[in-house]
């Protein structure tokens, strides 16, 4: 983990919660399962990781890897709000471009 999201959250007064070692292993297994196109298995790993976060009273999790949202779509009842970092980056990029008039005919 690079620490990018943690630093950004702290700069906004939000204290990040890192997944425990077992949850990190489940997240890694989730990513590997997605790469192997084993989406149901990936969702199971992700569900276990999210359950550990929920027990720690975490209500929002950043999906900071492109494979995780693929597994998340297969979840049935995620009780932790999931933020897709790739989707949010795309939204911010479009907003940035629109604010500057990029793509408009002169």
Segments (PLM) and residue ranges:
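Non-catalytic structural scaffold of enzyme domains
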Residues: 1-106
């Amino acid at each position: 983990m690079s620490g990018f999201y943690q630093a950004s959250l702290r700069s906004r007064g939000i204290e990040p919660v890192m997944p425990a070692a077992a949850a990190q292993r489940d997240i890694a297994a989730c990513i590997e399962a997605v790469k192997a196109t084993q989406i149901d298995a990936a969702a199971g790993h992700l569900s276990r990781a999210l359950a550990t976060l929920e027990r720690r009273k975490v209500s929002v999790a950043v999906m900071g890897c492109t494979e995780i949202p693929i597994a998340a779509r297969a979840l049935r009842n995620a009780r932790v709000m999931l933020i897709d970092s790739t989707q949010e980056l795309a939204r911010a990029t479009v907003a940035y471009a629109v604010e500057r008039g990029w793509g408009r005919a002169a």
